[in-house]
From Swiss-Prot:
Residues 102-141, 158-185, 211-245 are annotated as: Disordered. Transmembrane segments: none annotated. This is Vacuolar fusion protein MON1 homolog A. GO terms for molecular function: guanyl-nucleotide exchange factor activity. Disulfide bonds: none annotated. The modification Phosphothreonine is found at T158. It comes from Homo sapiens. It comes from the Eukaryota. InterPro entries: FUZ/MON1/HPS1_longin_1, FUZ/MON1/HPS1_longin_2, FUZ/MON1/HPS1_longin_3, Mon1.
Amino acid sequence: MHPGGGPSRAERLELGLGRERPAKAIFLHRRPGEGGGRERCLRCGHVCVRRGPGPREAVPSGRPRPDTLTPPWVRQRAVTGTFCASWTPLRNRRAQRMATDMQRKRSSECLDGTLTPSDGQSMERAESPTPGMAQGMEPGAGQEGAMFVHARSYEDLTESEDGAASGDSHKEGTRGPPPLPTDMRQISQDFSELSTQLTGVARDLQEEMLPGSSEDWLEPPGAVGRPATEPPREGTTEGDEEDATEAWRLHQKHVFVLSEAGKPVYSRYGSEEALSSTMGVMVALVSFLEADKNAIRSIHADGYKVVFVRRSPLVLVAVARTRQSAQELAQELLYIYYQILSLLTGAQLSHIFQQKQNYDLRRLLSGSERITDNLLQLMARDPSFLMGAARCLPLAAAVRDTVSASLQQARARSLVFSILLARNQLVALVRRKDQFLHPIDLHLLFNLISSSSSFREGEAWTPVCLPKFNAAGFFHAHISYLEPDTDLCLLLVSTDREDFFAVSDCRRRFQERLRKRGAHLALREALRTPYYSVAQVGIPDLRHFLYKSKSSGLFTSPEIEAPYTSEEEQERLLGLYQYLHSRAHNASRPLKTIYYTGPNENLLAWVTGAFELYMCYSPLGTKASAVSAIHKLMRWIRKEEDRLFILTPLTY
């Protein structure tokens, strides 16, 4: 016993009282005749020890029950029940409710992206998400896992650019040892097939490597696409050349690709031959700084940005006077680099320049310029590249599940990805288990299909490299439109170049299942309205928005409507989104929320760990109305998420 008359802690444990009286326990008057015993907690229902006087009860061993002893120090006002430590007294609960109400009130008044503590993130799919929501709980998050490489943010997509800018020759996506000579022969054969498919002219890589083969090269007459060189036309005067030069300078963005030896490879505008001296200056800048063990990344002067990205053996340069940041311009240059890899593979590109450092790469890329041109045009008007995500065709969840299940059942042993798309929008995607597609690879596939109308003529079997998945070799893609008069394109990616007939049979079985289940009619109906109107949201002043779920790698946006009907206005709107995006993802000082006011529209950006939201609002709207509209928009996206996103992706 302690000097104060109470038992020690060991004695209390021996008596069965267990833990000491909680500091937050409430004393209740003991009812007459009420004894001790075990009963459930007054608040949570857990079985707890009652502490009260009562008769001694014998147990089979003859010892008194420890939980029925009446300790002598228990007063008349005794505890008749215990409470769990998690229970809070009424007074404290009221204080907590008041604090919660104040926090909620501040959340509605100020949108700073840091209102919810990081250790109190919501783990439920709430109807109206909060900035502190955990990733995977936001609207549009896949319930069965992600389809793409898990890139949480824009920075995750561009983090590899640092090594390239510093002169690192690392080939991202290349796995395993360098290809053997037999592998190079296989890659050469695949490239010859791809060249025939895209340009109509077969090229043999082995012949290209012969001495003197690159001297005095001219464009093959049968090549399709923009000529790599543009000789002066007859009758051209000096004034016409000056006008052409002035028109060339008026373009807001130029893209150049050249080899480390200074050989021109690609130019967005103009002739590569006419710009060879300019490209030589660019290579000299890069080489001069590298000799000092440094690297040039960008030059900012007179409203222009000059961005350099080096991916050995290539150097890519962008010159722009747009709202894009240097980081976003570098991302576009990386897309151009990956586009070149998708045609050649990283292994073949390295092999070529190991054999000939001054090789003219236009020999192999001749005729494919339209694919690169189309990619730059898509990046200028399609927000998919800005968001680093894919957009889904709005479709009823039951129909999408039927399409995905039909793709899953119509499979072959060599298939890696089965993709159904329509107008650069994703309808369904089924992948091999433990194999994930990168959004950049999906964008390159979209660009390949939209660049050529020949795929509508029948079933195509073409080599394709997915540089973010594996830059060392070719896959083989079966590309076909389900019906000539629709935009539904089926893309089946296989690892076996000899498996055409088996993959073609997968297409036949897929179409049979669609007709049997009636899904082809629903798909036709959905293609009549491939985009939804912003009026469906029900916010009067809302003109347009972009919403991305980071965990799923998908985003949604309505159709661009008035006043952005012209192509110039649409590019201007995307330019405003690019400006907000660059401020939100600034490497030195990123912003969580941005409210931009302009003469024609107001914009709001909100970037959290789970999602990104960009809104275009009427210039007559106020900041308070824009902030209050966010919750309504997020509730609408939550309500329509099964129609706008792929929530249950399937695997083989």
